[in-house]
Amino acid sequence: RHWETLDSGSNASLYKLLQLNGGRLLVLGFGGTLLSSDDQGASWQPLSVPARAGLYGAAQLVDGSLLLGGHGGVLLHSEDGRSFELWQLPGRKNAWLSVAEAAPGQLVLSGNGGLLALSLAELKEQKQ
């Protein structure tokens, strides 16, 4: 067997790897680390995000947008997978460890505060 260590260019702990439609890879990690690869992981480019919280959960939604979850209740949303907007639900400061779209437009978040189900439309309305 052949194992190869990939150089991400980051010293951060990396927690989640997500393959997007079209094959692009995203990796999430400590302190708001978000890296992107368009060449099967051979090279990585950092993406700028509006939060320095650890990022743990990620999903590509049916509409093609991305939702990332992290420490301190941080949610990051992107329509294009390159620029992200910070969303936080009022009063929710727990870490979101997993993000899933259970049905089109219907989200389930899990974290140290348990499970939360809500619609994408509701999340967009309540974002801060």
Which residues does each predicted region cover?
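Residue-level hotspots at or immediately adjacent to binding/recognition sites across diverse folds
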Residues: 1-128
